[in-house]
Amino acid sequence: MIFSRIITVFCLLFFFVTIIYPQQKTDLYPVTEPDIYPSLMWAAVQLIPSPEWVTSTDGLKFGIRWQVTPLLYSFGINKKLSPWRYLIAEPFVRQSGSIELFFSPEYLNIKDKFKDMWLFRGGARVYIPLWQRGEYMSASLSASYYNFNGINGISYEGGIYLFAGILGFQTTYSPSFTNSEWIFTIRLRYF
């Protein structure tokens, strides 16, 4: 008798959670595509660099890094939304699980002349949500190809991101970047 009541309560609860509740939730919150576009304010925020430190034979040297994401595919957002983003990727779209192509110019204070201090990097990065679908914490792995004054090579990178990806800590390893194999970056990113 008690067993049949438990089964009945369980079936009613299952019916409510799987059929009635999701329909109510969907009706209250319709899914819409984001209405964001590049603007002057967005461009100004993109000019804020992220600080980084480069290992060298003289110790740590200071540098700064920017990043442009021309293409991103997100696999962690609502399936009713387009997973593709161009130039602008909302923090949740990126941190909830995505793959991006990126271009990253960097200023490294390891040469004597200003024109010789620029490193250009292009690559692919995957983001993996770790906590609260990536809003609280996520991680990334990437591989990139760089050019520094005619010296080319491959880099590998790992990162941890907090606060929907606004604050991140990245470590980049470039085996062929002689005497400066490691770069540590505090990444500041807004969109």
Language-model regions, residue ranges each:
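Predominantly the C-terminal beta-signal and adjacent terminal strand-loop region
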Residues: W42-S50, G153-F191
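Cleavable N-terminal export/targeting peptides
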Residues: M1-Y37
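Flexible, solvent-exposed coil segments and beta strand-coil junctions
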Residues: W42-V45, I99-F102, G134-S140, N149, ...
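Residue-level detector of intrinsically disordered/flexible regions characterized by low predicted structural confidence
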Residues: S4-I7, Y127, G158, R189
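A generic beta-sheet turn/junction motif
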Residues: T57, Q132, I160-A164
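Gram-negative (and chloroplast) outer-membrane scaffold detector with strong preference
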Residues: G63-Y145
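Short glycine/proline- and aromatic-enriched beta-strand/turn motifs that initiate or cap beta-hairpins
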Residues: P22-Y86, F191
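Solvent-exposed loop/turn segments connecting transmembrane beta-strands
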Residues: E52-I64, Y107-R121, S144-S155, T172-I183
